[in-house]
């Protein structure tokens, strides 16, 4: 029979490993139509849609009123992310329509 201390240590180790796997999985995005690499070009920022499609834009787009409003909506819906990508609360089709109609 295992002692309590050893059992607690083992459980903590498993929790840490599980947390690391969750973090790794949450950052993998395979459905990218705008850019296929995970690296971003210098001077660009990336957002993801609710259906996990990746969009990369030049930083100069941050001054665009439509982009600013979309980021405010994302902040209200999900909060400001401290880790991970910025996610917009709608699908890629609606996002594409929003930015193309401007």
From Swiss-Prot:
Cellular compartments annotated: Cell membrane
Keyword Cell membrane among UniProt keywords: yes
Main subcellular location: membrane
Gene Ontology biological-process entries: auxin-activated signaling pathway
Topology relative to the membrane: Peripheral membrane protein
Highest taxon in the source lineage: Eukaryota
Keywords: Auxin signaling pathway, Cell membrane, Developmental protein, Growth regulation, Membrane
Pfam families: Auxin_inducible
Cellular component GO terms, alphabetical: plasma membrane
PANTHER family linked to this entry: AUXIN-RESPONSIVE FAMILY PROTEIN, AUXIN-RESPONSIVE PROTEIN SAUR61-RELATED
Role this protein plays: May promote auxin-stimulated organ elongation, such as hypocotyls, stamen filaments and petals.
Similarity-based family: Belongs to the ARG7 family.
The protein, known as: Auxin-responsive protein SAUR68
């Amino acid at each position: 029979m295992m002692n309590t201390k050893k059992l607690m240590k083992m459980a903590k180790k498993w929790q840490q490993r599980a947390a690391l796997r969750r973090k790794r999985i949450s950052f993998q995005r395979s459905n990218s139509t705008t850019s296929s690499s995970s690296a971003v070009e210098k001077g660009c920022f990336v957002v993801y849609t609710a259906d996990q499609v990746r969009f990369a834009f030049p930083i100069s787009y941050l001054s665009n009123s439509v982009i600013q409003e979309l980021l405010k909506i994302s902040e209200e819906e999900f909060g400001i992310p401290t880790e991970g990508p910025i996610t917009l609360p709608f699908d890629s089709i609606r996002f594409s329509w929003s930015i193309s109609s401007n």
